[in-house]
Every structure is written in structure tokens, then in C-alpha cells.
């Protein structure tokens, strides 16, 4: 079950990183 948890964590981290990068590009 920990693999599913790890996958979910990685997916969440990737999404968070994407939003942070988008914010930086928009001038934050």
C-alpha cells in the first residue's frame, strides 16, 4: 500500500511544484 501512497505523494508534489513554477513565471 505504501507504493500507492508514494505515488500519490509524488503526484501532489509535482502538482505543487508546477503551480509554484507557474506563479514565478507570472511575476511572483
From Swiss-Prot:
Expression across tissues is: Expressed by the skin glands.
Where does it sit, as one GO cellular component term? extracellular region
Compartments (UniProt record): Secreted
Classify the source by domain of life: Eukaryota
Keyword tags:
Antibiotic, Antimicrobial, Cytolysis, Secreted
Tell whether Secreted is among the UniProt keywords: yes
Biological process terms from the Gene Ontology for this record are: defense response to bacterium; killing of cells of another organism
Query: Per its database record, what is this protein's job?
Result: Thanks to its amphiphilic alpha-helice(s), it may integrate into membrane phospholipids, leading to lysis of the membrane. Has no substantial hemolytic activity. Has antibacterial activity with a broad spectrum against various species of bacteria including both Gram-positive and Gram-negative groups.
Query: How is this protein organized at the quaternary level?
Result: Exists as aggregates of 3-4 molecules.
The family assignment reads: Belongs to the grammistin family. Group 3 subfamily.
This protein's name: Grammistin Gs A
